[in-house]
Amino acid sequence: MAHGIPYVATATTADLHDLEYKVRRAINIRGAKYIQIFVPCPLGWGLPSEQSINISRLVKESGLYPVFEAEHGVVTGVLKIRRKIPVEEYLKPQRRYAHLFGKEPLVDVIAKIQAIADHNIQKYQLLDEEAMS
């Protein structure tokens, strides 16, 4: 996005209609295009494969993974968060983050991760104010 290429987008496996829309859109744009897709790895992340779609939804709803489109370096659209969740809801189901929630939870680390999510929410204006009220 920093290079101002014609089209950049992010997507998750939780919303295949959004992903399809972005792929079709990218096909019709001249020049460089880039789509980053959040795809969970059940084996590597230590979660049941049937939770893959849910983890994709949780990362978006936590704000850790903003889902957006940008043209020539300018954000033109975002997929709003309907129900903001704490990052713990995304992190806890994954065995790769178990060390954060042991006998002595790493509260400071979790708070830093939450701060990143909150920054994304503010930067990309991700909250759907109508759905939140």
Language-model features: locations:
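Short, surface-exposed amphipathic charged segments that create phosphate/polyanion-binding patches used
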Residues: V23-A26, E50-S52
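Flexible, low-complexity linker and terminal segments
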Residues: C41-S133
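Short, conserved beta-strand edge motifs with alternating hydrophobic and charged residues
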Residues: A9-A11, Y34-F38
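Conserved thiamine diphosphate
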Residues: M1-R25
